[in-house]
A protein has these predicted regions:
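Membrane-proximal helix-turn-helix segments that form the acceptor-binding/catalytic region
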Residues: 1-18
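Conserved donor-binding/catalytic core segment of Leloir-type glycosyltransferases
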Residues: 44, 50-69, 75-82, 86
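Nucleotide-activated donor-binding/catalytic signature segment of Leloir-type glycosyltransferases, i.e.
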Residues: 95-117
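Short alpha-helical donor nucleotide-sugar binding micro-motif in glycosyltransferases
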Residues: 118-123, 210
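Acidic donor-binding loop of glycosyltransferase active sites
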Residues: 121-133, 146
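Short hydrophobic beta-strand element within catalytic cores of glycosyltransferases
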Residues: 127, 147-151, 160
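A charged, aromatic-enriched C-terminal amphipathic alpha-helix characteristic of glycosyltransferases
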Residues: 172, 186-223
């Protein structure tokens, strides 16, 4: 693997500018490439998601079924608390997760976009137990006016605001998530504030930031050559 590292580092040196999708990734760029990166988070199309006046009685996970996503934590916690959980997704971890699911947990498999939007709008909260570089699904939940209960590492720290758009659990364990779910029962959230927060990551904001960055660097380079 040594030659791959050498090639990768040499290739990075030829990059004019780095754009990272999160501060989490920008830190890795600094560490491994010793280069700075501007952070421009990926977009969520807020206009595709709607608020609902009706609160559902279930928690929601939308995820690829892979071990590192830690969907098992969400299933185990809801099993133990007897909470309703709907899980959308598919992947290599499906059989193991299906075997874990108790009577209050429903694995829906793949569903169409319209159904996913309905599930977001009607859930009590969105569970995000994995550690991701950024994570779009929490923002889709917020765009639907629903709070997020997230593992407090990685990209979730850049989208979830404690007590405003959701809450965190500190350890990636069932017990830690159970503590957060119990704490959630005592909390209240304003769905309109959740929506407003998601709109900070709207695709129109993303396009404007990308355009501004490209224009700035283009003008800097052209100005330097004149």
């Amino acid at each position: 693997l040594t030659w791959i590292r050498v090639w990768d580092y040499a290739s990075a040196a030829r990059v004019d500018y780095f754009i990272a999708n999160s501060e989490n990734v920008a830190k890795r760029i600094r560490k491994h490439y010793r280069r700075e990166a501007v952070v421009i988070p990926p977009p969520v199309r807020c206009r595709l998601f709607q608020l609902s006046e009706n609160d559902g009685d279930y928690f929601l996970v939308v995820s690829r079924f892979q071990e590192y996503k830690r969907v098992d934590i969400a299933i185990d916690a809801c099993n133990k608390l007897g909470l309703k959980l709907k899980v959308v997704g598919d992947g290599p971890d499906y059989r193991r997760l299906k075997a874990m699911a108790g009577p209050t947990v429903e694995l829906l498999g793949r569903v169409d976009d319209a159904h996913v939007k309905e599930l977001y709008a009607g859930c009590r909260a969105f569970l995000f137990p994995g550690e991701e570089d950024f994570g779009i699904t929490p923002l889709e939940a917020m765009a639907s006016g629903r709070p997020v209960i997230a593992y407090g590492k990685g990209g979730a720290l850049e989208t979830v605001v404690e007590g405003v758009t959701g809450t965190f659990f500190k350890e990636q364990t069932t017990d830690s998530l159970i503590d957060a779910l119990r704490r959630f029962e005592t909390m209240t959230f304003d769905k309109h504030k959740l929506r407003e927060h998601a709109e900070k990551f709207d695709d129109e904001v993303f396009k404007a930031r990308i355009k501004a960055f490209v224009e700035e660097k283009y003008n800097e380079r052209n100005g330097a050559q004149e």
